[in-house]
Curated annotation (Swiss-Prot):
Known partners and oligomeric status: Homotetramer; dimer of dimers.
Origin: domain of life: Bacteria
Lineage: Bacteria, Pseudomonadati, Pseudomonadota, Gammaproteobacteria, Pasteurellales
Gene: dapA
Record's keyword annotation contains Amino-acid biosynthesis: yes
The keyword Cytoplasm appears for this protein: yes
Name this polypeptide is given: 4-hydroxy-tetrahydrodipicolinate synthase
Species of the source: Haemophilus influenzae (strain 86-028NP)
SMART domains (alphabetical): DHDPS
């Protein structure tokens, strides 16, 4: 891995987990989604992250969905496994179960609800990294976890060999520069915010772990490819068309709007989510539909 050839880069899909009306994972639909993203030029898939409803899948279900995603990919696209938890022991269990699954790496979120200190975050991720040889991507999303992992803590963790990068989802693009300065140019920084993804790449991020690319996969792949090549005019043209969609896919809690949008576009058979998440409110649906039209998807 080097700054010129990072392990993970470009348009990375925060993949939805398709379900039927009974809340069971729809594996035939999942296989079609994997094919769709390969054909569209996506650079990697995150299986069972936040957008994949990791919080309401059991450990056994998490592992099965990830393993099936790897199986469907057939080595044609890297699969990153969502393997985080707010209990270090549970995150270690998940990570160990994925050791021989064929995943390219693991995405591990800052522990949520229990609000660890910076030292607690460091020890949490250090313990996970020490249990595996799999590349680890940190995930900082304070709006969901209630805790913000500071760039200085990220830099400490970057010294651990198999902690290779971070999904940075504060929305503060200045963090990209700060982390690069402290952690070094070979440490991968991936934007976790579609609205600021292009700006993040301009400031040195290697790509975007995106919700939007669930439904605009080719556009997002093209945007990231142009941006990483320095062709910002073409990247800006695509991003401007998608900006309303970037916003409206978070008009209710993620992944509620993106599942409805994927259903509306025929990419999945049902917009069903597991409780406590419910399908997109009827009064909100026209707004998301308008965003799809503005993006040129309808």
């Amino acid at each position: 891995m080097s700054a010129q050839n990072p392990l993970f880069s470009g348009s990375i899909v925060a993949l939805v987990t398709p379900m039927n009306h009974y809340g069971e994972v729809d594996f035939s639909c999942l296989e079609k989604l994997v094919e769709h993203h390969i054909e569209a030029g996506s650079n990697a898939l995150v299986s069972v992250g936040t957008t994949g409803e990791s919080a309401t899948l059991s450990i056994e279900e998490n592992v099965k969905v990830i393993e099936k995603t790897v199986e469907f990919a057939k080595g044609r696209i890297p699969i990153i496994a969502g393997a985080g938890a707010n209990a270090t022991s549970e995150a270690i269990t998940m990570t160990k179960l994925l050791r021989d699954s064929g995943v390219a790496g693991c995405l591990s979120v800052v522990p949520y609800y229990n609000k660890p200190t910076q030292e607690g975050m460091y020890q949490h991720f250090k313990a996970i990294a020490e249990c595996t040889d799999l590349p680890q991507i940190l995930y900082n999303v304070p709006s969901r976890t209630g805790s913000d992992m500071k760039p200085e803590t990220v830099a400490r963790l970057a010294e651990i060999e198999n902690i290779v990068g971070i999904k940075e989802a504060t929305g503060d693009v200045s963090r990209i520069v700060k982390i690069k300065q402290l952690a070094g140019k070979n440490f991968i920084v991936l934007s976790g915010n579609d609205t600021t993804g292009l700006e993040a790449i301009k400031l040195g991020a290697e790509g975007v772990i995106s919700v939007t690319n669930n439904i605009a996969a080719k556009d997002m792949a093209d945007m990231c490819r142009y941006a990483l090549a320095g062709d910002f005019d073409k990247a800006e043209e695509i991003n401007a068309r998608l900006m309303r969609l970037h916003h409206d896919l978070f008009i209710e809690s993620n992944p509620i709007p993106v599942k409805w949008a994927a259903y509306r576009l025929g990419l999945i058979k049902s917009p069903h989510l597991r409780l406590p998440l419910t399908t997109l409110s009827e009064e909100i649906q026209p707004k998301v539909e308008d965003a799809l039209k503005i993006a040129g998807l309808l």
